[in-house]
From Swiss-Prot, chain A:
GO terms, biological process: endocytosis; Golgi to endosome transport; late endosome to vacuole transport via multivesicular body sorting pathway; multivesicular body assembly; protein localization to endosome; protein targeting to vacuole; reticulophagy; vacuole inheritance
InterPro entries assigned to the protein according to its UniProt record, in alphabetical order: P-loop_NTPase, Small_GTP-bd, Small_GTPase
Note: Present with 8759 molecules/cell in log phase SD medium.
Protein name according to UniProt: Vacuolar protein sorting-associated protein 21
Topology versus the membrane: Lipid-anchor
Gene that this sequence comes from: VPS21
Modified residues (Phosphoserine): S188
Organism (species): Saccharomyces cerevisiae (strain ATCC 204508 / S288c) (Baker's yeast)
Length: 210, 603
């Protein structure tokens, strides 16, 4: 068993109805890698992916619809290590919004956040839908801002896994140890308290290193 | 017992995607807001409950209702979450102060703000700070904590310990009048006093059952009780009532004080040698965001920047400022700060809470327990130059809490004193802290080493640090650099120690009888403003009472059972249930664990 697991908080951003939730659904319910079922916590969806002997555990924060009326909370971006900024290739407005979200992330989120720009719904182009955002436009924005770039279809599953693999690969392998030591340091310095670890003898899981 | 009017639960109202109870084997993908069915792009036409204001009580209520299966529309007239519980940046505070002084934020008055030029255009940016409008601490054994675990909202948050509770006495930060009588922590404490203290602690852990002891004092003050019944002296009495009990004045009644002292003691050592916790990045502002997110996941619709204009109780239609409307089949719940224009039913907010929030350019680490970044300082009645009658509480947060940058600290001072005296008391407390801090930083004084170990695992109950002792005469050369000072008066309907009682919410409930012609708020229910209480204790009570009004019973209030196969979380849930059981009786805390803890305190 591989013991080095890197946990990554990944947030989804983008205009309502571009397919954010569908991408997550596709990703977590696919037979992906040699992985088991996704695990469901009340807080976020989690999915483990093994990349080169190294396990990345994505903690995926969907917007829960809070983006629909411009109501995302600062807590949402906080400490996110990765973000998918999604737009719909058939909706130019959603690409303008994507720029806005990239800017917002650079202002609000941690400096070294890995952002993937994702043009979704490419299946619609085969079905006679008209492309309104050129692939080059997406590529250009990604290059300017240093983002990963993908075009996907949550419907057919095309490229969806690659988005997450791409992010997983950008997390350097050594980050695992770094992260562990960093978070250990943080715990001793900042006395982070795990609310699941009460001293009443019921919590035998104090050794967990998730 | 389910009451007959009880509304159907989520499970009954919605086709089950996956049954947890029947089949606890691996989940695939849950029914999620927006995952299974795309969410509509417009706000709903019809909801069960409309909530205006995203403060703590409203947010906890929204989450409880969403998970119960109610269709909730949750709005806020502000462009941020939190309302009366918000955590704001410096720029947001500037706007807020202007709004208060224009009279457009009700329940707040007399806001005065100073911001150093170092913030914004200099060394620090507005966003480096997260200032709570009503800061709170979380006791390790409390209703809210068990709900945080059950709802898993705690997974959105980070908590840190708070172990230092200082008492200021005798015109100086000498710990107490006579350091030899420092409560618990001094080996020189006379044997007799120690015995009396221990006797009291054993009693207080199970006080309700021992009516013969406290009933005769039920209508008298706590200090009479401690002095007469337990032969305790002023230093212990003060520390028990003010530092441990966090009470506001000497007139506190016996049952209230006992309950508050026990709150500290039973919370101690639940997660470690400290009684309370603070959330990182902000207090109630952060928690309300967490509960709102949870509610959204449970299906609630969120809309900020939305103001209620009126509610028509006959047609049950609520109208908003942007012209949109929604039909509300059950109840409209509003925070007093979100009351529509021409409202006539807002409950009277007759109690003042005076607050002063300062950001100081000084790390002040001397005041924190090692590794921590939070402390409480309590100024008991009569301890300040101003001759204060009410306590001034100062809640201190450092950079480790991520609400302010390295090298700075936030002081939240507040008092329950009413009227102009309050500001004098707060100013006196500020001056005392300033002086103490300057002495501290110049002297590099070490924390006191004399500590009696009280529990089996070597932890002390009270870890009060002597601040600046013996530097009473020291006159500092430097002055403290204040980056920010915000003074304001907040109004609330909840008196100090006031328990939110159900009848409060009946103000508008006598249906047509109480409708006022032309009022924009006939038939709505108002929530309570935060009181002066520094803990979250009132929040759950208020949310639960409102929940019961809406659903018909509070039996399934946060009756969530997140089962999943994530090992870690599964054990977390088991633990949460245990924990719940331990405090289920609310005021009647299960004494098994705590009894042991007393037993080990051999003297
Ligand atoms: N054709 C097509 N439809 C999609 C795709 N992804 C999502 N959708 C549809 O777009 C709508 C909105 O998707 P959703 O995931 O709820 O978007 P969100 O609001 O960004 O989370 C739904 O009706 C989806 O079925 C895609 O790749 N192709
Ligand atoms: Mg969605």
């Amino acid at each position: 068993m591989n013991t080095s697991v890197t946990s990554i908080k990944l947030v989804l951003l983008g205009e309502a109805a571009v397919g954010k939730s569908s991408i997550v659904l596709r990703f977590v319910s696919n037979d992906f890698a040699e992985n088991k079922e996704p695990t469901i916590g009340a807080a976020f969806l989690t999915q483990r992916v093994t990349i080169n002997e190294h396990t990345v555990k994505f903690e995926i924060w969907d917007t829960a619809g809070q983006e629909r009326f411009a109501s995302l909370a600062p807590m949402y971006y906080r400490n996110a290590q990765a973000a998918l900024v999604v737009y719909d290739v058939t909706k130019p407005q959603s690409f303008i919004k994507a720029r806005h979200w990239v800017k917002e992330l650079h202002e609000q989120a941690s400096k070294d956040i890995i952002i993937a720009l994702v043009g979704n719904k490419i299946d619609m182009l085969q079905e006679g839908g008209e492309r309104k955002v050129a692939r080059e436009e997406g590529e250009k924005l990604a290059e300017e801002k240093g983002l990963l770039f993908f075009e996907t279809s949550a419907k057919t599953g095309e490229n969806v896994n690659d988005v997450f693999l791409g992010i997983g690969e950008k997390i350097p392998l050594k980050t695992a140890e770094e992260q562990n030591s960093a978070s250990n340091e943080r715990e001793s310095n900042n006395q982070r308290v795990d609310l699941n670890a009460a001293n009443d003898g019921t919590s035998a899981n104090s050794a967990c290193s998730c | 017992m389910l009451s007959p009017e009880r509304r159907p639960s989520m499970a009954e109202r919605r086709p089950s995607f996956f049954s947890f109870t029947q089949n606890p084997s691996p989940l695939v993908v849950p029914h999620l807001a927006g995952i299974e069915d795309p969410l509509p792009a417009t706000t709903p036409d019809k909801v069960d409950v409309l909530i205006a204001g995203t403060g703590m009580v409203e947010s906890v209520l929204a989450a409880a209702l969403a998970w119960q299966g109610s269709n909730v529309l949750h709005i806020d007239k502000n462009d941020y979450y939190g309302d009366t519980s918000a955590t704001l940046t410096v720029d947001q505070i500037k706007r807020w102060v202007n709004e208060v002084n224009e009279g457009s934020v009700s329940c707040y008055k007399n806001a005065k703000l100073y911001v150093s030029t170092l913030i914004g255009s200099g060394k620090y940016s507005s966003r480096d700070f997260g200032i709570d409008l009503s800061p709170k601490i979380l006791f390790a054994k409390s209703d809210l904590l068990s709900i945080l675990i059950k709802s898993r909202v705690h997974q959105y948050l980070e908590f840190q310990s708070l172990s230092n509770f200082h008492t200021y006495e005798n015109d100086c930060f000498e710990k107490l009048t006579n350091t030899k009588q420092e409560i618990f922590t001094d080996q020189n404490l006379p044997l007799m006093t120690k015995r009396n203290l221990m006797k009291f602690i054993k009693f207080v852990l199970n006080w309700e059952a021992q009516t013969e002891i406290w009933q005769p004092y039920a209508e008298r003050t706590m200090s009479d009780f401690l002095v007469e019944k337990f032969k305790l002296e002023k230093p212990q009495v003060f520390e028990l009532i003010f530092s441990i009990g966090l009470c506001y004045d000497l007139n506190v009644k016996v049952p209230e004080a006992l309950q508050r002292i026990r709150r500290y003691l039973t919370s101690f050592d639940v997660y470690g040698p400290f009684p309370a916790l603070c959330s990182k990045y902000g207090g109630p502002g952060e928690l309300s965001q967490g509960f709102c997110r949870s509610a959204a996941v449970g299906g609630a619709t969120y809309k900020l920047n939305e103001k209620l204009v009126s509610f028509n109780p006959t047609t049950k239609v609520a109208t908003f400022q942007d012209g949109s409307k929604v039909e509300v089949s059950e109840k409209v719940i509003i925070s007093p700060t979100q009351a529509p224009k021409d409202s006539k039913h807002v409950p009277q907010q007759q109690h003042q809470v005076h607050r002063l929030t300062c950001i100081v350019e000084n790390p002040c680490t001397e005041w924190f327990n090692e590794g921590e970044s939070a402390a409480m300082v309590v100024f008991p009645p009569g301890s300040l130059k101003s001759g204060n009658k009410e306590v001034v509480q100062a809640f201190i947060l450092g950079a480790g809490s991520e609400i302010c940058p390295e090298g700075t600290i936030v002081w939240y001072l507040s008092t329950t004193e009413q009227g102009p005296r309050a500001e004098m008391d707060i100013d006196a407390a500020l001056e005392a802290m300033e002086m103490a801090l300057l002495r501290e930083s110049s002297s590099g004084l070490e924390n006191d080493e004399e500590i009696v170990q009280l529990t089996g695992n070597g932890h002390t109950i009270v870890n009060s640090v002597k601040l600046g002792q013996s530097f009473k005469e020291y006159v500092p050369r430097e002055r403290l650099q204040f980056l920010f000072k915000l003074y304001y008066t907040q109004y609330t309907s909840t008196p100090p120690f006031g328990v939110v009682n159900s009848s409060f919410f009946d103000v508008n409930q006598d249906l047509e009888k109480k409708y006022i012609p032309g009022a924009s708020d006939n038939g709505v229910i108002y929530t309570t403003m935060p009181s002066a209480e520094i803990s979250y204790d009132e929040v759950v009570t208020a949310a639960k009472v409102l929940y019961e009004k809406i659903v018909g019973s509070d039996d399934d209030f946060f009756d969530l059972d997140f089962e999943d196969e994530d090992e870690i979380q599964a054990s977390g849930v088991a633990n949460a249930e245990q924990f719940e059981n331990a405090i289920d009786d609310d005021d009647d805390v299960n004494m098994e664990g705590s009894g042991e803890f007393v037993g080990e305190m051999e003297i």
